[in-house]
Amino acid sequence: MQEKHGKAACDFVPDTYILPDEFGEFYEHYQKLKQYDSKKNVWIVKPANAAQGRGIMLIDDVNDVNVDETSVISRYVTNPLLINGHKFDLRVYVLVTSYEPLRVYIFQEGLARFASETYTSKIDKNNKYMHLTNYSINKKNAKFVQNANCEQDDVGYKWSLGAFCRHLEQVGIDMDLLWSRSYDVILKTMLTGEPYIQNAMRKNGTHRTNCFEILGFDILIDSDLKPWLLEVNLSPSLACDSPLDMMIKSTLVCDALNIAGVRRFDRKKESLNKIKHRMKGLYNKSKKSTAGGLVGLPGSEIFAG
């Protein structure tokens, strides 16, 4: 993204490298940071094609990097905005219904996901519950609190986006400014990927109206209210482990299907319509035959008189 549009326009993505192919570039960057500020020379490593937080680790020593394994390494954001002393990120859901033209819907509701240990500036590489916000990781912590009532959407370590917004407004944060910045991140990301997906659709012969996609944007807010794009998830999990999950994700799916124009299938009604259509066809065929007209043979453009 930064290679195409420049770092100034896309400075919302932490410095990121694909290993082992870009290890040389990463190593050079690591050494420069080490000279100036070793405390901020912390990186997060994610195995390629992994999900649910599997294999993620923090490193501050280049020797801990496994250069024989395909992975993504990103600079760790060391000044996250905290709520009640905990680090969090936002799962923002985005629906794409067309790429020619690009048509994107950003859902107003989503999730704020919290780390289950109190955050400190001292980096403890082994404490994933403090640094990582992945639900699949934190639910294994004995301190994890699950939301048990969707009407209380600011309880536990997973909130609704609505609860998140209300909390920040109460402490005096300009939510209009924050969302404007977050929407800018989402739209720039979509515009960057647009030509690649258009080309793929043309090669596969996929018609632009035949598909849609729900994306999950993971966004971290730092202490300066700057949104950082951590990753974009294709087909994000729709699993519901709590009433809050069910409320948000069921609404998400219903809205997505309605916007995409997917209609409910009624088997009885559909069968009746097919019978009516077939009977109407037979009636018209019989009517044409008795009138001395031409009758088209089914499945052909050959006519018999």
Cite the ranges covered by each PLM segment.
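Acidic, PEST-like segments
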Residues: 1-4, 11-29, 70-77, 81, ...
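Short, flexible, solvent-exposed loop/turn segments with mixed acidic/basic and small polar residues
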Residues: 4-6, 46
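Glycine-rich phosphate-binding loop of ATP-grasp-fold ATP-dependent ligases
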Residues: 15-17, 38-66, 81, 90-91
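Substrate-gripping "pore-loop 1 plus following alpha2 helix"
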Residues: 35-37, 72
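Short, glycine/acidic-enriched loop or turn micro-motifs at the edges of active sites
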Residues: 49, 221, 234
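Hydrophobic residue at the +6 position relative to the catalytic HRD Asp in the kinase catalytic loop
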Residues: 217-219
